[in-house]
From Swiss-Prot:
It is found in: Membrane. It is a single-pass membrane protein. Cytochrome P450 monooxygenase; part of the gene cluster that mediates the biosynthesis of loline alkaloids, potent insecticidal agents composed of a pyrrolizidine ring system and an uncommon ether bridge linking carbons 2 and 7. Lolines are structurally differentiated by the various modifications of the L-amino group and include norloline, loline, N-methylloline, N-acetylloline, N-acetylnorloline, and N-formylloline. The chain crosses the membrane at residues 10-30. Residues 173-184 have a biased composition (Low complexity). The keyword Acetylation does not apply. Residues 161-184 are annotated as: Disordered. GO terms for cellular component: membrane. Residues 163-172 have a biased composition (Basic residues). Belongs to the cytochrome P450 family. This is Inactive cytochrome P450 monooxygenase lolP2. GO terms for molecular function: heme binding; iron ion binding; monooxygenase activity; oxidoreductase activity, acting on paired donors, with incorporation or reduction of molecular oxygen. Keywords: Alkaloid metabolism, Membrane, Transmembrane, Transmembrane helix.
Amino acid sequence: MDLTQFNTAGIVWLTVAAIAISYILQSSFLSWYRLRHIPGPFLASISSLWNVLNIVTGRTSPVLEKLPGRYGPLVRTGPNYVLTDDAEILRHVNGVRSTYPRNGWYEGFRVDEYDHMGSHIDTSVHDAIKSKVIGGYNGKDGIDLEGAIGSQVKTLVSEIRRTRGSRPRSRPRWMPARWSRSSP
């Protein structure tokens, strides 16, 4: 067989196709290999096609709910994604000195394009903000939070009784159940 018989454009396209196929196979193998110890559906371990199929068919939520029962508390749902239903794993991942970095998912919590403690991706900035506000969460700041909320609820109830009367109406003016859809 003489190589001069081949068209130069055909050789170029064959080379491009070989490089593309090689790249796809190599990237699929590397993405599978990194999280190979975490069980899950095989198609989910090598590509995002498994997630796309679940989204398109509208069964993402029921499928994801069943995965921990089938594969265990930590399940691989994509080449770079894992799912857990174990609170201890979540505490470990989101812990104070966790080595797991935050990803872009947390940016969705921004309010009017301003970052806050829950939306910062940089762990050091997140920890700095957290150390400033932790006093409000640990209960050692001397504020009787339950008593303060209880007194505000009592004030609200007394104000409602004062302005609307103490007796409830026999029938409300509008009925939200009429506008809702009953399930069979």
